[in-house]
Amino acid sequence: MVKYLNQKEAINVDLELFNEYKFSVDQLMELAGLSCAHAITKCFPADRFGRVLVCCGPGNNGGDGLVCARHLALMGYTPAIYYPKPTAKPLFENLSHQCQRMEICRIDECPTVETSANSYDLIVDALFGFSFKPPVRVDFVPVVELLQQTKLPIASVDIPSGWDVENGKLNDCDLEPTLLISLTAPKLCAKHFKGKHHFLGGRFVPPALQRKYELNLPEYPGNELCLELETHK
């Protein structure tokens, strides 16, 4: 059975990938974001869900979102990026620049529920990852409220934004994505996920690291970058 990680385990696995296995942040971010794009194509085909709002947070989860948006643009989608608090680090500045040069639209104001319903077919939630601690910062309150109130399908990257990493929803009004894409290994909060699709992405975990943490990750089929897991309905 696949292991679901608590917050400390998730942080330690990441640290070992960086420190022991010498992966770089941008290397893992590229692989993670690409696997998210592939999972989205399997659940939301471009001919029906082509207009995508990608909501990016200030940390690595937001970086995954920027990478995902770039790959979606290459896969026949028309993404738009909402990035309310850009991170002033070269990696994130470069990712933003790449999206700009790919002619991906970036919007400056969070759309209303009504505007988003008319303008988009799908929302990608790449706001907060497994390091999130409540409360939500003021810059992100409007977009979190949009995610809570929208009727559009949502694809959440690793952690549904606003959820506790281990315990899931903190409030009844918290968002419930249609698709959850767990990265590296699922986190404990994924056991509380009731949506339609749960995918695993991030096909880069070394065998020795899998054994050390007893991750019991399923084998990815063929050359796939993601695979579907059972949901706990």
Swiss-Prot record:
NCBIfam families in alphabetical order: yjeF_nterm
Keyword Glycosyltransferase: no
Keywords in alphabetical order: Isomerase, Metal-binding, NAD, NADP, Nucleotide-binding, Potassium
The protein, known as: NAD(P)H-hydrate epimerase
Highest taxon of the lineage: Eukaryota
GO MF assignments: metal ion binding; NAD(P)HX epimerase activity; nucleotide binding
Cystine residue pairs: none
Cofactor: K(+)
Catalysed reactions, semicolon-separated: (6R)-NADHX = (6S)-NADHX; (6R)-NADPHX = (6S)-NADPHX
Protein's job: Catalyzes the epimerization of the S- and R-forms of NAD(P)HX, a damaged form of NAD(P)H that is a result of enzymatic or heat-dependent hydration. This is a prerequisite for the S-specific NAD(P)H-hydrate dehydratase to allow the repair of both epimers of NAD(P)HX.
